[in-house]
C-alpha cells in the first residue's frame, strides 16, 4: 500500500474508521481534507445488502441531483427528424445518426453522456463494444433510451448521475464538489439514497443500506450514521 502524504496522514489521524459520524460532521471532515489544488469531487460509496451475482438483484438507475454535480456535461444524442431538433433545442452538443456512429467508430468520443431515441437503436446497437466499456451505452433503465430526448438532455445537463452496483455489492457515485455548501452536498446525498431505496430489489433480504461512506478525491473515507440523514 502506498504511503499516505503528510497531509493525508494528519487528516486520517482525525478520523475513526470504525465510528459512524453524523452527516454534518462527516461532511465537515471530508471538506476539510479536500485541500488539493483543484476542486475535488465528493464521492460516496454505499454497501448494499444484495447478492450482486444474482441477476434479479442488480441495482441500477439514475437520479437528478438537486444541487447538480458541479461538472459541465457534453451530451450526444442519436435522433432524427423532430426529435433531433428537440435534442438540439434542449442543449445537446452533438446530434446525429449514421454520421454520429461513424464519429464514434473513429474514436471521436468528445462527450460525457449518450442518449438515444428508441428508433435509433439499430444504429446505436452496433456501437456496444465501443460505448459499453466506457459506461456510455444508452440504456432504458437509466433513462438514456427514451422517446423524450429533450427531457433526457435537460436531466443530464441538470446533474443527473447514473449508478450501478459493482461485483462487491457497492454503489459508487459523485455527489458534488468540495466547493459545494454542506447543505447542497447533503441534499444530493439524500436524493441518491432515496433513489437507491426505490431501486431495492424485491428479492433483497435483511438490511439493504448497510454502510455509507464519504470521501474526497484525494481523501480517506468517513462513515456516515444513516439515522442522521433524514433529520434536517
UniProtKB/Swiss-Prot annotation:
Recorded superkingdom: Bacteria
SUPFAM superfamilies: Ribosomal protein L1
Family: Belongs to the universal ribosomal protein uL1 family.
Keyword Cell membrane annotated: no
Protein name: Large ribosomal subunit protein uL1
GO molecular function terms noted in the UniProt entry: rRNA binding; structural constituent of ribosome; tRNA binding
Gene Ontology CC annotations of this record: cytosolic large ribosomal subunit
Protein function: Binds directly to 23S rRNA. The L1 stalk is quite mobile in the ribosome, and is involved in E site tRNA release. Protein L1 is also a translational repressor protein, it controls the translation of the L11 operon by binding to its mRNA.
Classification via InterPro entries: Ribosom_uL1_bac-type, Ribosomal_uL1, Ribosomal_uL1-like, Ribosomal_uL1/biogenesis, Ribosomal_uL1_3-a/b-sand, Ribosomal_uL1_CS
Keywords: Repressor, Ribonucleoprotein, Ribosomal protein, RNA-binding, rRNA-binding, Translation regulation, tRNA-binding
The protein's assembly and partners: Part of the 50S ribosomal subunit.
GO BP term, pick one: regulation of translation
